[in-house]
Amino acid sequence: MSRYGADTTTDEVLEGIDFSGKRVLITGSSSGLGEESARALSAKGAAIIMAARDPQKNEAAAARVREKVPGADLELRTLDLCSLESVRGFAKGFLADHPRLDVLLDNAGVMCCPRGTTSDGFETQLGTNHIGHFLLTGLLAPVLLDSAPSRVVVLSSAAHLITGMDFDDPMFERRDYDPWQAYGQSKTANALFALELDRRLAEEGVSAYSVHPGRIVTELGRHMNEE
């Protein structure tokens, strides 16, 4: 039985672990779990790349991290997962600057937002939560392989139980849009992606995991009502 539970903190999970010399890239670092991951991992010596869509919010998050972890090794970069052009530009810049990546934390996401599409025409939740990360991870695969043993952690959710993938209409073009169905589908995609990525790359030293973070009040739930 796991010794961790609903009250377990990030610091308790990382007790006794040294991340000195490790480089960790976190998407969605400007708030919530991304910001907390940056704080906890930097406190253990990791060099953190904080990647987020809004540079000002990312700067504010980094300032909060540095207040708690003086001397934290933080690098801030702009990444918009709703734009494949942005993802490609981000990956190109990262690979040019960094020959090593030990951990990729695919954390950024949206939940239960109104119907919409990304700049590339994908349904917003599937496009942001899965497709953007799918491309990012693929583009960074060479540096992950060069840095092996390395790992990819994909933030999925127990919401994957809501629905599987509707491969006939993944973008809700021929059915009524339901924000929970769309969110659940994106989380199923996250989980399936991590499983297949691990199957393909584990023997080469890149492990992939999908995780359910639990019910945590963060900015992710901004589209939900109080109930």
Positions of the model-derived regions?
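Rossmann-fold NAD(P)H-dependent dehydrogenase/reductase core
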Residues: 2-225
